Amino acid sequence: MQVSDFHFELPDELIARYPQPERTASRLLQLNGNSGELNDGQFTDILDLVQAGDLLVFNNTRVIPARMFGMKASGGKLEVLVERVLDEHSVLAHVRCSKSPKPGTMLLLGENQEHEAEMVARHDTLFEIRFTSDKKVLDILDEIGHMPLPPYIDRPDEDADKERYQTVYNKKPGAVAAPTAGLHFDTEILEKMKAKGVEFAYVTLHVGAGTFQPVRVDNILEHHMHSEYAEVSQEVIDAINATKARGGRVVSVGTTSVRSLESAAQHALKQGTELAPFFDDTEIFIYPGYEFQVVDALVTNFHLPESTLIMLVSAFAGYDNTMKAYEQAVNNKYRFFSYGDAMFITKKTA
């Protein structure tokens, strides 16, 4: 398939630049992967779509304030976007400035250039940066970092984004982009699901800035996915096995949860073992033709044209079903991308 097969026209006004006043106030487009049937509704309808015995799998990563501004010690403004925290004092980051810094370049970061760091090495398009102070990287980011809103939101971050560009169940710091399907859940709707007999499990995938990188090839088979770190614990494996045994569904909240679970499944297939814990980097690329091993239903936002995420949704729901759903979403003026509306999709099995 060609990348252009996943193109659709999206009016600029449908890109959500701010979240709804309430997390659960978004709309929900339901898609039946087998029949292709579409139903327009509200996100709160999800309470009727999940059943007792189902397992919802959330990504509990926490978005770090990964964007920093500053200058080279020799002069010249720059912007640093952390891609990954390497250890307590080092990060791997994208650096935007007029001239790329060379190893040994000293950087002064923060509004008042209060934190000094050294550009230690370059790894392809990324720069390894080490802070010189005894403070831990995460503490420095909390002090001077900005929330790394996606480029299409096209506005500076605001105080409200510290809360709203974060799930209510976040736990493990490390993401530089939110697992956005989870943004629709508040504590009240989670409590109602629990009361209904729905089970919860949590994986961790630290979403990288690579999630926003365009696919730069024509044939999707030539695309190489960026690497992200994922954790699927024994507790999650046990919950999945128990769910399948009782006839329940594994409902993935977000494409990052899908990629975590299916990475564990693919690793087990390669090893010739039962589904087992997974703690490793993953470059899994899911596109039409992929056979899902774990996930039965998916909660997800509306994704960018020609992105790997709309390819994943097409693999899950069927290509034609997905493109028709997106056409309806545009016609019915759903809000798109990170702060936008959501879909509830059941897997195409026939």
Swiss-Prot record:
GO terms classed as biological process: queuosine biosynthetic process; tRNA wobble guanine modification
Domain of life assignment: Bacteria
Keywords: Cytoplasm, Queuosine biosynthesis, S-adenosyl-L-methionine, Transferase
Keyword S-adenosyl-L-methionine: yes
One Pfam family named in its UniProt record: Queuosine_synth
Enzyme Commission code: 2.4.99.17
Enzyme class: transferase
Reactions catalysed, as given in the entry: 7-aminomethyl-7-carbaguanosine(34) in tRNA + S-adenosyl-L-methionine = epoxyqueuosine(34) in tRNA + adenine + L-methionine + 2 H(+)
Record field: transmembrane: none
Listed GO MF terms: S-adenosylmethionine:tRNA ribosyltransferase-isomerase activity
SUPFAM superfamilies reported in the protein's UniProt record: QueA-like (SSF111337)
PANTHER family in alphabetical order: S-ADENOSYLMETHIONINE:TRNA RIBOSYLTRANSFERASE-ISOMERASE
Subunit architecture: Monomer.
Record-given protein name: S-adenosylmethionine:tRNA ribosyltransferase-isomerase
Organism in which the protein naturally occurs: Aliivibrio fischeri (strain MJ11) (Vibrio fischeri)
